[in-house]
Amino acid sequence: MNYGYVYDPARIAAAKERMTSAGFATSFDADRPHLKGNWERLKSLGVTMVLAQVDELKATGINRPSNEQRRGSCVLQGSGRSIVDKLNTMIADKSIVCEPTEVAAEVMYGYERKKHWSQTHPWGCQCGSCPDGLTGQDAAEFYATMGVVPRGIYGGVDLSKPNEQLAILWNNIGVPSNLLDVASNHKIICHASRTWDEYADAISAKHWGWICLPGICQAHSIDADNCCRIDGAGGHCTECCGIVVLPNGETAFIIQQSWGNAIKYPPTIQTASGPIQLRQGSYAVRQSELERLGTQVERHSCDIPTSSAF
């Protein structure tokens, strides 16, 4: 089964090198040194949770349900939603003045897939055997260097609603150039974190992001605090949309899946401040559970410059 995340260390390193050579920041720790130790500072002040769903509710009036992924487009789903959540946070805290906006990450997916398969399939893949999927760094490179497209209709191309099939089509024929022109007005700052402690600093500072793991979390495999265990095979990318302190003082990350109602995770988790209800499709994973996965992971976070206002 292909969940849509491709782990390719050489490709990840090459994308980071291209970004660095072009003057784009790639390291959260290096680019945001003032946030080093942010999560520990917040905990010392009594903070036990930082959740994207709180800002989403404040900015939009609702907590949107999970995306409805049907293909191996998880990098599209996880990265796109993290950018939307970051925009909602900026609207909620009044650091940007605009209407809540969804982004069409299909543009990123089609462009990056076409780019990486062009050598073996110069005129588009017709073999039917190539897997779906990208690395998490593919998405980061596109958003930082090319930008994102707000949902809407552009010259007859309807991006007003999610459309996985359009993203797959663009794997073959390429993304229309007018969409890349739109994207260039909305570039995103994307960082990678080297450790889960560093990532805790990013997420607790509300730099929501996407994580890519060599496994999936099963709804039936939970502990006493309703945290999920990673016990399923298959590379997968999901949004990371929060961080909490558990009753025993451990840290857990809040993850947002993109499979609609296909998997029903526990709606409530236990925290140091008592039980909290998560938005539909979200679940908690202990940091210690994530750390046991080793180095075959990617941890990305995002920020939106005010010059990229939607």
Describe the predicted segments one by one:
Residues 1-98, 102, 124, 128-148, ...:
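Structured alpha-helical subdomains that flank or immediately precede key functional sites
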Residues 96-121:
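Acidic helix-start/capping segments at beta-turn-to-alpha-helix junctions
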Residues 2-7, 70, 76, 80-84, ...:
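Predominantly the structural core of cysteine protease catalytic domains
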